[in-house]
């Protein structure tokens, strides 16, 4: 049994290519990109776009991108895309994959030309300036595996008998001890809002405030296991629930989802402005 949010029948979602038989085009086609309004889940969370309680970014890693140079020779590249937290739309991932595939048989004079096109198209889809960085020198580009820092919640030996999302697990979340600490878990699993395909993630929670009850926090994270929502929406829900139930001075929630279709999505939400985000590839990515 899956758990869907109230907005899952919104007409915007019914027009997405997700869950439908689609044509894989190999000629450049920016119309393949599809947007999902961030307001869908934010309205349910009672968030105002004019006064959001967080900052952050959706960091995408591209592993499958290719085009033809002016002589018709294929070029391959990896890339990093950063979508601002306050863009009007998030970018639907299957449409992003189909869009990238449309570059396969299209000619571009340079990597800079491709980067310019990607930046323009993704910014248009998100309705906010998006940054794009591409790499073609794959033999001289470092992309080492890393690990989260802090204390792992997964060592807790707890019994679980319910897998339906339940924020009430966070009742009385904070003690009276003031701390600054980082906690993480590899047990976050949610499901695609449209197809119910499993989405796997590791999540890092860094905060300053009254100490959080680790067992309650882990039980809450596991309760996403049958919940249907997009990656970005899950992270915002987790951020808001921790802020609601905990006595928190500052908070950063950073999830790194496993790769699908040559893309991984890594949403980060934080109480503070950020200039840089650690694009740390984990083992399952």
UniProtKB/Swiss-Prot annotation:
GO MF term set: preQ1 synthase activity
Gene3D superfamilies: 3.30.1130.10
Annotated binding of substrate, by residue: 91-93, 231-232
An example Gene Ontology biological process: queuosine biosynthetic process
Subcellular location: Cytoplasm
Pathway(s) of this molecule: tRNA modification; tRNA-queuosine biosynthesis
Keyword list, A-Z: Cytoplasm, NADP, Oxidoreductase, Queuosine biosynthesis
Active-site residue list: 192 (thioimide intermediate), 199 (proton donor)
Residues binding NADPH: 93-94, 260-261
Role this protein plays: Catalyzes the NADPH-dependent reduction of 7-cyano-7-deazaguanine (preQ0) to 7-aminomethyl-7-deazaguanine (preQ1).
Family statement drawn from the similarity comment of this UniProt entry: Belongs to the GTP cyclohydrolase I family. QueF type 2 subfamily.
Protein name, as recorded: NADPH-dependent 7-cyano-7-deazaguanine reductase
Species this protein is from: Psychromonas ingrahamii (strain DSM 17664 / CCUG 51855 / 37)
Lineage, broadest ranks: Bacteria, Pseudomonadati, Pseudomonadota, Gammaproteobacteria, Alteromonadales
């Amino acid at each position: 049994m899956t758990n869907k949010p109230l907005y899952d029948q919104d007409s915007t979602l019914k027009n997405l290519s997700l869950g439908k038989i689609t044509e894989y085009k190999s000629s450049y086609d920016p119309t393949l990109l599809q947007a999902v309004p961030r307001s869908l889940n934010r309205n349910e969370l009672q968030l105002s776009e004019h006064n959001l309680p967080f900052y952050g970014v959706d960091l995408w890693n591209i592993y499958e991108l290719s085009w033809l140079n002016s002589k018709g020779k294929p070029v391959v590249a990896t890339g990093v895309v950063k979508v601002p937290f306050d863009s009007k739309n998030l970018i639907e991932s299957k449409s992003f994959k189909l869009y990238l595939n449309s570059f396969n048989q299209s000619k571009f004079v340079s990597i800079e030309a491709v980067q310019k096109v990607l930046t323009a198209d993704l910014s248009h889809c998100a309705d906010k300036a998006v940054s794009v960085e591409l790499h073609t020198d794959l033999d001289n580009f470092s992309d080492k595996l890393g690990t989260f820092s802090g204390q792992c919640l997964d060592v807790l030996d707890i019994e679980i008998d319910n897998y339906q999302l339940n924020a009430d697990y966070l009742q009385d979340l904070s003690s009276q001890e003031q701390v600054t600490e980082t906690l993480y878990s590899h047990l976050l699993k949610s499901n695609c809002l449209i197809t119910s395909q499993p989405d796997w993630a590791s999540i890092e929670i860094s905060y300053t405030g009254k100490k959080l009850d680790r067992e309650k926090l882990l039980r809450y994270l596991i309760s996403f296991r049958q919940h249907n929502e997009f990656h970005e929406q899950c992270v915002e829900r987790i951020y808001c629930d921790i802020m609601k139930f905990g006595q928190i001075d500052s908070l950063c929630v950073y999830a790194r989802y496993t790769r699908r279709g040559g893309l991984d999505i890594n949403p980060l939400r934080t109480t503070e402005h950020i200039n840089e985000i650690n694009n740390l590839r984990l083992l399952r990515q």
